[in-house]
């Protein structure tokens, strides 16, 4: 991204001219300084500069194929674009203060390298409307693959922690209240599952991103007999847009991108919320690595969970980006409107935030130290084995309604005495229901409770091991997709 100062309207030395713009013939002068300040977009759309080079090379080839650019001019233009691409990559070419947007800057850069006679021919048959829609799709397709790879790394960190603690039992909660004992690995893999679905959402989104609007012109297509399919193929798209109006004016691909990126953040935020509680003294489930926590400026004892807190806080930012983009799109008539300039900043920002959050969250998770004894100690607290007592009665032929009532009565007695269910006497059990025999104590252990939940997806160790294998297999497959370049 270029230095924002380079495009500061306050530094304009060409006030009142149209230098750096791709329009102006019917205007007697350029925009006012305030108008330019409102219009300029190089401070955020410069990320599209490498894609402008790729798209321009493809466009030059179809101009040549259509007889609108000679072979010699094509060779000159491609050489100039290659040099421009290198100069963008090494930072030697950046937007000038007079450049309105990335497109104007890149055309200026090309003309500087090949002259106006050749460079001025490139714009034939294309509009900024179809150009930016195509380039934005290209940028997003690469960006979501980078994000997907990082999501798999977080998934792998969760899976590795699950593998390292296969037998650790912890309290399972509903409504933030003690519910049933579960395996820690079961809980960690439960956070991996939505992240896998997030990558699948990116994969599915990519099918809609892979439609090229190039060739749609401003809105109605082109009369120059260009070949949109050829450009689409060269740029890695699956097809060209079926409707030029839709191709230039639709941004549902952007709002869908914003949603999936926000959903990734939301899924990380749920994990972050749990870690924040897990590392408190009251829970004591985990200790954070010094590398992924901070201290207090006044309280020497503090070890603060800044990473999960920032994940939680920045998630609101990604949700805001989605909401803002949807509000921008809601009332736009066909076809292109300048409002659509507002599509890029929220997406670029959401990608940037995830590029910060994902590696930090992965580092945090991979270095968590779990305290298995503490989790095991708390697992039966709150009478989490009450369901096991009821289900034992069901296996003895008691209707669940009666078993549920009996188990609740046992909880009431144990609570009044300040003991666990397993500590109730034979007489106390029988006083609740004569069918509660001493054999019920066989299921009133957290190990037995966990092992008994052996249906697919359950918390029994054998089932959790299967879940981990499936998570790792799917994560590897999705990473394979994400690491495959869009363009060969």
Curated annotation (Swiss-Prot):
PROSITE patterns: FUMARATE_LYASES (PS00163). Pfam families: ASL_C2 (PF14698), Lyase_1 (PF00206). It is an enzyme of class 4 (lyase). GO terms for molecular function: argininosuccinate lyase activity. CDD domains: Argininosuccinate_lyase (cd01359). InterPro entries: Arg_succ_lyase_C, Argininosuccinate_lyase, Fumarase/histidase_N, Fumarate_lyase_CS, Fumarate_lyase_fam, Fumarate_lyase_N, L-Aspartase-like. Gene3D superfamilies: Fumarase/aspartase (C-terminal domain) (1.10.40.30), Fumarase/aspartase (Central domain) (1.20.200.10), Fumarase/aspartase (N-terminal domain) (1.10.275.10). It is found in: Cytoplasm. It catalyses: 2-(N(omega)-L-arginino)succinate = fumarate + L-arginine. Its EC number is 4.3.2.1. Pathway: Amino-acid biosynthesis; L-arginine biosynthesis; L-arginine from L-ornithine and carbamoyl phosphate: step 3/3. The keyword Repeat does not apply. Signal peptide: none annotated. GO terms for cellular component: cytosol. Disulfide bonds: none annotated. GO terms for biological process: arginine biosynthetic process via ornithine; L-arginine biosynthetic process. Its main location: cytoplasm. Keywords: Amino-acid biosynthesis, Arginine biosynthesis, Cytoplasm, Lyase. Belongs to the lyase 1 family. Argininosuccinate lyase subfamily. HAMAP family: Arg_succ_lyase (MF_00006). This is Argininosuccinate lyase. It comes from Corynebacterium jeikeium (strain K411). The lineage of its organism: Bacteria, Bacillati, Actinomycetota, Actinomycetes, Mycobacteriales.
């Amino acid at each position: 991204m270029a230095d924002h100062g380079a495009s500061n309207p306050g530094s304009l030395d060409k006030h009142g001219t149209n230098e750096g713009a791709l329009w102006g013939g019917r205007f007697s002068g350029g925009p006012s300084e305030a108008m330019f300040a409102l219009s300029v977009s190089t401070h955020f759309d410069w990320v599209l500069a490498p894609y402008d080079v790729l798209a321009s090379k493809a466009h030059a080839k179809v101009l040549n194929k259509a007889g609108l650019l000679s072979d010699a001019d094509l060779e000159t233009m491609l050489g100039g674009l290659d040099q421009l691409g290198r100069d963008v990559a090494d930072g030697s070419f950046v937007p000038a203060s007079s450049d309105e947007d990335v497109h104007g800057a890149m055309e200026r850069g090309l003309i500087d390298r090949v002259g106006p006679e050749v460079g001025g021919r490139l714009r034939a048959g294309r509009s900024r409307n179809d150009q930016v829609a195509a380039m934005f799709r290209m940028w997003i397709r690469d960006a979501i693959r980078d994000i997907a790879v990082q999501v798999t790394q977080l998934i792998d960190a969760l899976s590795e922690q699950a593998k390292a603690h296969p037998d650790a039992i912890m309290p399972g909660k509903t409504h933030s209240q003690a519910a049933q004992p579960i395996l820690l690995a079961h809980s960690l893999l439960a956070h991996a599952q939505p992240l896998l679905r997030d990558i699948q959402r990116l994969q599915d989104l990519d099918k809609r991103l892979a439609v090229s609007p190039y060739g749609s012109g401003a809105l109605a297509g082109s009369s120059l007999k260009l070949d949109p399919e050829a450009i689409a193929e060269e740029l890695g798209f699956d097809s060209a847009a079926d409707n030029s109006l839709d191709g230039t004016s639709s941004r549902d691909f952007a709002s869908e991108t914003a949603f999936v990126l926000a959903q990734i953040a939301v899924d990380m935020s749920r994990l972050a919320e749990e870690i924040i509680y897990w590392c408190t003294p009251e829970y004591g489930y985990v200790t954070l690595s010094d590398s992924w926590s901070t201290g207090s400026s006044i309280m020497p004892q503090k070890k603060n969970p800044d990473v999960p807190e920032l994940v939680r806080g920045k998630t609101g930012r990604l949700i805001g980006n989605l909401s803002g983009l949807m509000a921008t799109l809601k009332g736009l008539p066909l076809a292109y409107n300048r409002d659509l300039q507002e599509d890029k900043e929220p997406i670029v920002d959401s990608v940037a935030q995830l590029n910060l959050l994902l590696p930090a969250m992965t580092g945090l998770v991979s270095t968590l130290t779990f305290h298995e004894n503490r989790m095991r100690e708390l697992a039966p607290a709150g009478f989490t084995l009450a369901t096991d007592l009821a289900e034992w009665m069901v296996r003895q032929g008691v209707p669940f309604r009666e078993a549920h009532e009996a188990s609740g009565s046992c909880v009431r007695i144990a609570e009044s005495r300040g003991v666990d269910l397993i500590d109730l006497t034979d007489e106390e059990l029988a006083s609740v229901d004569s069918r509660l025999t001493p054999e019920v104590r066989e299921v009133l252990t957290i190990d037995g409770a966990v092992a008994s939940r052996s249906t697919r997806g359950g918390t029994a160790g054998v089932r959790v091991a299967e879940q981990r294998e499936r998570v790792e297999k799917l994560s590897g497959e999705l990473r394979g997709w994400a690491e495959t370049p869009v363009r060969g």
